[in-house]
């Protein structure tokens, strides 16, 4: 008798396990944020290590969130794709709240450049997740400043940029970004490309946003205001 679970049961089990892991990581992340909020580098000798632990837990939480979304297939009844009008001020407030303690603990300044009253249509939860993931990465690579800039382009796109003043993306990561924006999940090698999952997820979220013949897109480049890495999400 073959006791091997079939594919649907295995997928459900893996998704449930990932969800439990994400909940545990969220508890750990929240605990670290509270500890860091009560400490300073002067009063707590382990402050730098705690800040690094917070970065790593947020990175792991991002990966689990992305895996869950892919398992549940965003756009199906199990994980609906919900596009609604939202003021950019509300979007940015959510992102800043999620990143505040990590930025503070790592000594990184967040610069904001956007019109808080501008309204755009997008899936709020997914875009918050993509921007938070991009800022987490920028915090790791920057010298001391991360910039979140959101603007409309002359040809009618909403451009969301996360920039830093670090050394810029290495060639391998720029190539990974180019691959992630072109390939399907089956073509991405997540095992050999550590950045692949986050980039693929972000590009899929971008492509899900459509208006008439336009689809959202993602690109990575070096330059921007500070000459470092630039994560650029474009929504129609």
Annotate the PLM regions.
Residues 84, 109-118:
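Conserved catalytic submotifs in the C-terminal HATPase_c
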């Amino acid at each position: 008798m073959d006791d091997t679970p079939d594919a649907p049961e295995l997928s459900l089990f893996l998704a449930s396990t990932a969800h439990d892991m994400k909940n545990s990581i969220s508890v750990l992340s929240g605990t670290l944020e509270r500890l860091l909020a009560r400490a300073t580098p002067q009063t707590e000798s382990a402050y730098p290590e705690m800040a690094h632990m917070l970065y790593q837990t947020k990175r792991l939480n991002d990966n689990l969130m992305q895996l869950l979304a892919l398992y549940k297939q965003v756009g199906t009844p199990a994980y609906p794709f919900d596009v609604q009008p939202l003021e950019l001020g509300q979007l940015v407030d959510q992102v800043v709240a999620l990143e505040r303690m990590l930025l503070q603990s790592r000594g990184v300044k967040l610069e904001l450049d956007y019109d808080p009253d501008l309204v755009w249509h997008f899936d709020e939860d997914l875009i918050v997740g993509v921007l938070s993931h991009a800022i987490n990465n920028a915090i790791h690579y920057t010298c001391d400043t991360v910039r979140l800039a959101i603007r409309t382009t002359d040809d009618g796109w909403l451009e969301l940029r996360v920039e830093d003043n670090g050394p810029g993306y290495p060639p391998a990561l720029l190539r990974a970004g180019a691959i992630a924006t072109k390939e399907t999940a089956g073509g991405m090698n997540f095992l050999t490309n550590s950045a692949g999952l986050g980039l693929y997820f972000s590009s899929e979220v971008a492509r899900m946003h459509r208006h008439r013949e336009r689809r959202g897109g993602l690109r990575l480049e070096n330059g921007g205001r500070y000459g470092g890495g630039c994560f650029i999400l474009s929504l129609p």
